[in-house]
Regions:
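Active-site loop/oxyanion-hole signature of alpha/beta-hydrolase fold enzymes
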Residues: 137-190, 194-204, 369
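Conserved HGGG/HGGXW glycine-rich cap/lid loop of the alpha/beta-hydrolase fold
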Residues: 74-151, 172
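Short beta-strand/loop motif that positions the catalytic acidic residue
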Residues: 316-317, 323-325, 329
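Flexible "cap/lid" loop of the alpha/beta hydrolase fold
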Residues: 200, 204-251
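Catalytic active-site module of serine/aspartate enzymes centered on a nucleophile-bearing elbow/loop
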Residues: 2-5, 342-380
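N-terminal cap/lid segment of alpha/beta-hydrolase-fold proteins
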Residues: 55-87
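Conserved alpha/beta-hydrolase catalytic His-Asp/Glu region
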Residues: 245-315
């Protein structure tokens, strides 16, 4: 009798849970259907903005003087573009002697390192303005698995390998002379991995560094603007990392392409700080995101999530450093840049108002002015 009663209670409990689950699923189905209609309407309205300053911008079509392929130690082919200076400037001789010692040339090369799910086009406006000025030799490359570069044959991507890939690019394209490294997001992390492996380059060849919207570690603590209930979890995205690395690219691709409109809205939400950014800019960033294969995305997640290289920043203390971040960055929040400053106490720090993670695109004029002023302090 007692067992029968317990069985009845369990049965009612199960029916109750099933009923609740059914209600949740039903509400979710209605919500999804309504959400799809709403998102498409919102995207159409957003893209029709008549005052978009970048509606006619030729993203991804900037000129270069040389294009080449650099092959890394693990056999990955990297696509590289080089822009030569028109007149060129030299670094201040006393500055170079103090920071790096004797150099065969005082003309610097600026090497740009882009972030996750992006490509060299991330630095579109910096490249455009510096090319117009004609003062600096510049090197741009697509990271492994991104843009026009090749993919790793097997296994997961690792930041130490990205650091070695950067070294391969430097050895091939800047065999001599001073180097200024500029890294955004994962590009900054790549620079840290490079510094961890080759600290001798800093204060010898690398005479200055620029870290934009990046982090030295503890990305697992980032809440990414998630609702408070989810964000209370110590590592809210850990299940995603563990699951994504086991999924096939096809599974993730189907999920990513289920709604390109949703992808556009998410890009605007997480990439930008302004509530009404340029639709053309949002589309450009979303296109770079979508060109990165789902397989590449999954194979990068673990190394980014476990990135911890604050000690590597010690190597960067030997030369001037600039740290830039948008005050509304939800991917690598301001606190991450502030932590970098604790390890680089002499670095310049600029927090750009009303800007998100792609600050160098969203507020290009401000970032260009900041970067050029920093570079001019190094020149004669």
């Amino acid at each position: 009798m007692k067992a029968s009663r317990l069985s009845g209670l369990a049965s009612r409990s199960m029916r109750k849970r099933a009923g609740l689950l059914g209600a949740v699923v039903g509400i979710a189905a209605v919500g999804v259907a309504a959400g799809v209609v709403a998102e498409r309407t919102l995207v159409r309205r957003s893209k029709r903005a008549l005052d978009d300053p970048y509606a006619a911008e030729d993203f991804g079509l900037l000129p270069y003087d040389e294009a080449l392929t650099v092959t890394t130690a693990d056999g990955t082919d990297l696509y590289v573009e080089i822009v030569e200076p028109i007149d060129g400037v030299e670094l201040d001789a006393e500055f170079v002697a103090e920071v790096a010692g004797t150099m065969t040339t005082l003309e610097p090369t600026i090497v740009f390192v882009h972030g996750f799910c992006l490509d060299m086009g991330t630095f579109h406006f910096q490249r455009k303005e510096l090319t117009r000025r004609g003062d600096y030799r510049m090197v741009f490359y697509d990271q492994p698995g991104h843009g026009r570069s090749g993919r790793l044959e097997s296994g997961e991507y690792e930041l130490p390998a990205l650091g070695e890939a950067l070294k391969s690019v430097l050895d091939e394209t800047v065999p001599e002379g001073p180097i200024v490294l500029v890294g955004h997001s994962m590009g900054g992390m790549t620079m840290m991995a490079f510094a961890e492996q080759h600290p001798e380059y800093f204060g010898d060849r690398v005479v200055a560094t620029v870290l934009i919207s990046t982090s030295g570690g503890r990305l697992e603590e980032t809440k990414f603007g998630l609702p408070a209930l989810i964000a209370k979890a110590g590592s809210p995205l850990l299940p995603l990392v563990n699951s994504a690395t086991r999924l096939s690219g096809g599974v993730i691709d189907r999920a990513r392409h289920a709604s390109s409109d949703l992808a556009w809205l998410l890009t605007r939400r997480y990439g930008f700080g302004d509530t009404k950014p340029s639709p053309a800019l949002v589309s450009y960033v979303e296109e770079m995101n979508s060109r990165t294969s789902a397989e590449t995305v999954a194979r990068y997640l673990r190394t980014l999530y476990t990135h911890a290289r604050y000690p590597a920043l010690k190597a960067l203390r030997s030369a001037p450093a600039l740290v830039v971040v948008g005050d509304k960055d939800m991917i690598t929040p301001v606190t991450h840049s502030e932590e970098i400053l604790r390890h680089l106490p002499d670095a310049e720090f600029v927090k750009v108002p009303d800007s998100g993670h792609v600050v160098m695109l969203e507020h290009a004029d401000e970032v260009n002015a900041i970067l050029i002023a920093f570079l001019e302090k190094l020149t004669a």
